Design a protein with these regions (language model features):
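Surface cap/lid and interfacial helix-loop subdomains adjacent to catalytic sites
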Residues: 1-30, 37, 41-62, 169, ...
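Soluble catalytic regions of membrane-associated enzymes that act on cell-envelope
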Residues: 72-255, 264-277
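Aromatic-rich transmembrane-lumenal/periplasmic boundary elements in polytopic membrane proteins
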Residues: 52-84
Length: 378
């Protein structure tokens, strides 16, 4: 049997090599090497399910201790507006490493009052960890109870913020929002994994999207029950896998406005993100993949901006309805890593380079995929 399988694989390699010679005019040696690499990748893909499950199980055991740790200097909050406080339904010890960081940090009302020069409210931060309850449904029920307890639905803005793989939320983004609204804010999130993002990115994408959909549906359903004149503005934010998790809640763009979101910011969306990919494929003619334009930017826009002025230039034209902004960089491997890189040159490598990508980068079969993948894991 092994001999027969080997012969079949060898025949496939030879057939691929002949195709590569005709298609790309490669030398015999290079074509044979590339053909072998392709077959190896395909064989690995066939057994990937078994290997991936074992890898994820092993990674979970390795990184579980980190999730139970607490960063030096991080202490349990005593403010009732924070999950993990003595008044909270979510126990401090259950929030995970990143959850404890999130609820224990950030500006308080006193600091915001000093910075903005007017009386501020205490920002609300709601978070549930993997250990906060035994099931996804129980975690969502507790999360809604936390929102009610903390008064989150009475704030000016309510931000749903799906996390990255480890449960991380960008502290700069959270702080910026709280500064803008002088603390009249509530940010809500839920942990779905404790694995590093690059591991979750490679093997746990469906879980992130399912978790994002569950949290967004739960919070939005409760928000929609409020009288229209008493609802906070509903915002959505996500970075990297948090962006993919957020996109998992929507089949297409009209669902975002139908659910009542005022604005959406997705930073560094993974290439497999359903909405991002669909919009990019359907972008307006003659607009680049690295910074596409869709429907002339009426409701969705893309920016490579590195600072507020650049982003403002991309978003300064009047919007219509819900605002959706994708912030992405031309050198971000999370955005550009795709299985398609194995065998076809993407538009972003055929176009003039984006703001921070080297112009010397070229596409080569197989090689470019692994180059970008290595950058992702770096």
């Amino acid at each position: 049997v092994c001999v027969a399988v080997a012969r079949v694989l060898l025949d496939i390699i030879k057939t691929l090599a002949r195709f590569l010679i005709r298609r790309w005019h490669l030398s015999d040696e290079v074509a044979l090497f590339v053909g072998t690499a392709i077959v190896v990748v395909l064989v690995i893909t066939l057994i990937n399910g078994v290997l991936l499950r074992g890898f994820l199980a092993g990674a979970s055991r390795v990184f579980q201790p980190q999730n139970t740790a607490t960063r030096e200097g991080v202490v349990q909050p005593d403010r009732p507006e924070r999950s993990g406080s003595p008044e909270s339904f979510a126990a401090w010890d259950s929030l995970g490493y990143q959850g404890r960081n999130f609820v224990a940090t950030g500006p308080g009302a006193e600091e915001l009052t000093r910075i903005n020069g007017r009386p501020a409210k205490e920002p609300i931060r709601v978070y549930v960890g993997l250990q906060t309850a035994d099931t996804d449904e129980a975690r969502m029920a507790l999360l809604l109870s936390e929102l009610e307890r903390s008064g989150a639905f009475e704030r000016e803005v309510l931000v749903i913020a799906p996390t990255t793989g480890t449960g991380w939320i960008n502290p700069i983004a959270s702080r910026a929002l709280e500064l803008m609204y002088n603390g009249d804010t509530a940010i809500v999130s839920s942990q779905y994994s404790h694995l590093p993002s690059w591991i979750s990115f490679l093997g746990d994408q469906e879980k992130s999207m399912a978790s994002g959909r569950m949290m967004i549906d739960a919070v939005q359903n409760r928000w929609a029950q409020l009288p229209a004149d008493r609802r906070p503005r509903l915002l959505l934010y996500g970075e990297s896998l948090g962006s993919m998790a957020g996109q998992g809640a929507f089949d297409w763009l009209p669902d975002i406005s139908r659910m009542g979101f005022s604005s959406v910011l997705w930073v560094g969306p993974p290439n497999a993100s359903p909405l991002w990919r669909g919009i990019t494929v359907r972008r307006d003619p003659r607009t680049p993949e690295v910074e596409p334009r869709y429907d002339n930017g009426r409701t969705v826009r893309f920016s490579q901006g590195n600072d507020a002025s650049q982003i403002a230039a991309d978003t300064g034209v009047p919007w219509e309805g819900t605002r959706v902004l994708f912030l992405q960089h031309a050198s971000d491997p999370v955005v550009w890593l795709s299985p398609d890189l194995l065998f076809s040159r993407p538009d972003w490598l055929a176009e003039p380079p984006g703001n921070d990508r080297t112009a010397s980068m070229r596409w080569y079969p197989i090689v470019t995929f692994w180059q970008v993948a290595a950058d992702l894991m770096n």
